[in-house]
């Protein structure tokens, strides 16, 4: 077993009184030097449960900078859907996340809070970390700003679910 390996097993029963969740996952703030990403999932562009028709399933590499979609009005962006594996690394060390069931991930220099509170992309301030999200599920993107709300089939409304994944940090030899 690798030193520091974490086998996460999160079982959830959502209270009916609780509002719908837009997403469920784990958010980590990692060393900003972990700037290279490699993943097996939908790519190379961002992809969501309702926005992946132009994406292909495969092995991709990108810098964290390139995973961010620079929309004029900041918003949720850069997620990669239907992943089995993601690795963030640099020349000395890295971290790997894998799972038997597909997950989504997002690696960015911007927090979700920063994206929500700013109205123009030039106002964004980078975090001191890589903001790394490993998600069991997210709502679809929809188009409520210029079209319909998220369709029911793309709404995350699970009441009982279990999210299992393995996280392995490593140092290159």
Predicted regions located by residue number:
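Beta-strand/loop-rich accessory regions of lumenal/periplasmic or secreted enzymes
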Residues: 1-173
């Amino acid at each position: 077993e690798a030193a520091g390996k974490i086998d996460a097993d999160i079982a959830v029963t959502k209270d009916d009184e609780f509002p719908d969740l837009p997403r469920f996952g784990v958010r980590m703030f990692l060393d900003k030097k972990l700037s290279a990403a490699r993943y097996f999932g939908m790519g190379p562009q961002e992809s969501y449960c309702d926005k992946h028709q132009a994406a292909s399933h495969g092995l991709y590499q990108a810098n964290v900078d390139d995973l961010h979609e620079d929309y004029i009005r900041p918003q949720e962006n850069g997620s990669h859907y239907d992943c089995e594996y993601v690795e963030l690394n640099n020349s000395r060390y890295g971290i790997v996340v894998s799972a038997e069931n597909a997950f989504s991930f997002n690696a960015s220099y911007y927090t979700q809070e920063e994206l929500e509170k700013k109205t123009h992309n030039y106002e964004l301030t980078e975090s001191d970390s890589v903001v790394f999200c490993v998600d069991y599920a997210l709502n679809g993107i929809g188009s409520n700003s210029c079209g319909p709300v998220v369709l029911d089939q793309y709404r995350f409304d699970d009441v009982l679910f279990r999210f299992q994944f393995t996280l392995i940090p490593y140092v290159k030899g």
